[in-house]
Design a protein with these regions (language model features):
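Extreme N-terminal, non-catalytic leader segments
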Residues: 5-24
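N-terminal polybasic phosphate/anion-binding patch
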Residues: 40-41, 52-63, 78, 171, ...
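Well-ordered beta-strand positions
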Residues: 50, 56, 154, 198-199
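ATP-dependent NMP and nucleoside kinases share a basic, alpha-helical "lid"
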Residues: 120-129, 137-168
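Small-molecule kinase domains that catalyze NTP-dependent phosphoryl transfer to phosphate-bearing small molecules
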Residues: 148-149, 171-220
């Protein structure tokens, strides 16, 4: 990714805002770990909102041969590769960086600019070519990636009580309570995310209650000129 291509992309995103007045450039969707963001994202999709998923893009930018892949191998060595196909073993890499802030920052430095570039490239296509009014950036690290936050309005945060999040992680990830607690503590405070949000979705009830909250937000977003 060259500086020229990055500059062109930023110019295109700014052009979107100029062409469409005060309309939304990208709606931000983030939340706490195990808060149910993926479920909320699916409900938004069912309501006709286009989703650009950072996790999906993050997996693609580290395919063998890609620049981010080469940078990760250079930083962490070939021990993190799956022998069969030379793809990155996400579980092994995750375990390596989990309790090491310096290594997490190193990984982010290897991947974030490629993820952001691909997300904004899709935004330009969806807004300028296909003329979609509402496009959501579904990004777990939206606030931590400050550049992305600048181009998101409004921002939606999915929240749930800590006890529910821990229970979900124990079932979904086969983690012990202490491990689940560690993963929560390793992330930005959910309370801080909620303070920075324009909408908060509380995911502690039924799927019907969750859907009702999403539909209410979709109705509000459609009223934005």
């Amino acid at each position: 990714m060259t500086n020229v291509s990055t500059a062109f992309l930023v110019f295109s995103v700014l052009l979107i805002g100029g062409e469409m007045g005060n309309s939304v450039v990208a709606i931000g969707l983030t939340g706490g770990i195990a808060a149910g963001k993926s479920t909320v994202s699916k409900i938004f999709q069912e309501a006709g909102v286009i989703i650009v998923d950072a996790d999906v893009i993050a997996r693609k930018v580290v395919d063998p041969g890609k620049p981010a892949y080469r940078r990760i191998i250079s930083a962490f060595g070939e021990d993190i590769l799956i022998e069969r196909d030379k793809t990155i073993d996400r579980a092994k890499l995750g375990a390596l960086i989990f309790n090491d802030i310096k290594k997490r920052k190193t990984l982010n430095a290897c991947t974030h600019k490629y993820i952001i570039y691909e997300m904004f490239k899709r935004l330009v296509l969806l807004k300028l070519i296909y003329r979609h009014q509402m496009v959501i950036f579904d990004a777990p690290l939206l606030f931590e990636t400050h550049f992305m936050e600048l181009f998101c309005y409004p921002i939606i945060v999915v929240s749930c009580p800590k006890a529910i999040a821990i229970d979900r992680m124990k079932k979904r990830n086969q983690l012990g309570e202490h491990q689940a607690e560690q993963r929560i503590c390793a992330q930005m405070s959910l309370e801080l995310k909620k303070q920075k949000a324009h909408f908060v979705i509380e995911n502690s009830g039924s799927i019907d209650e969750l859907t009702e909250q999403v539909n209410h937000i979709v109705s509000a977003l459609r009223k934005i000129p």
